A protein has these predicted regions:
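The conserved Walker
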Residues: 14-15
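Conserved phosphate-donor/acceptor-positioning beta-strand/loop module used by diverse small-molecule
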Residues: 97-117
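Phosphate-binding P-loop
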Residues: 1-6
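Glycine-rich phosphate-binding loop used to anchor ATP phosphates in small-molecule kinases
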Residues: 55-99
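Conserved substrate/cofactor phosphate-moiety recognition/catalytic segment
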Residues: 23-67
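Walker A/P-loop
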Residues: 20
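Small-molecule kinase domains that catalyze NTP-dependent phosphoryl transfer to phosphate-bearing small molecules
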Residues: 122-162
Length: 177
């Protein structure tokens, strides 16, 4: 499969927003041709220290390259990342991905920080910097008119239905081309 035939749905959001949970639950649905990946679970070798936005772009490029070269049977990859929406758009355009969508998974700060403390045992990520990152991502998503899945008050199942609808719409566009 070449890049022009691969559909990419980038899920972005701050730590604790619910991206990984949604990606794992989506995989449990076993939708033919669709697979979710936690992109941060790959180590990118770099000769120089990159800024975090460059590292996230490198990670996104790695997954696009990996998925487009292998015979995986994947038509649509859902990539769980923390890349900024603007940077994700740049990378997707540079890589000539014809079918792409960026979706923000968002959550109010109190709930996100509660998840980081209680559910994930990562209290070090519940900080002002992560709150600012979440606000920045929300601002970009709003400015770019992106779909937003707000997990603040919705059950995982309801948020998963929202994601499944977005995946279905993108998959339909790919298959009808």
């Amino acid at each position: 499969m070449n890049k022009s035939q691969l559909a990419i749905l980038v899920l972005t959001g701050a730590s604790g927003a619910g991206k990984t949970t949604l990606t794992l639950k989506l995989n449990e649905l076993e939708i033919p041709g669709v697979k979710g990946f936690n992109c941060d679970r790959v180590k990118i070798e770099s000769d120089e220290m990159s800024a975090s936005t460059d590292l996230q772009a490198d990670i996104l490029r790695y997954w696009i390259s990996h998925l487009s070269q292998s015979e995986t049977g994947i038509e649509l990859a859902v990539l769980d990342t923390q890349i900024s929406p603007h940077r994700a758009l740049e990378v997707l355009n540079q890589e000539a991905i014809n079918y792409a969508q960026i979706v923000l998974v968002d959550c109010d700060p109190a709930k996100r920080n509660e998840r980081l403390h209680m559910d994930r045992s990562q209290p070090e990520l519940a900080n002002a910097q992560m709150d600012c990152w979440a606000a920045y991502l929300r601002g970009q998503a709003d400015a770019l008119g992106l779909s937003i899945i707000d997990t603040s008050n919705d059950s995982v199942e309801k948020s998963l239905v929202e994601l499944e609808l977005l995946v279905g719409d993108l998959l339909t566009r790919v298959r009808s081309s």
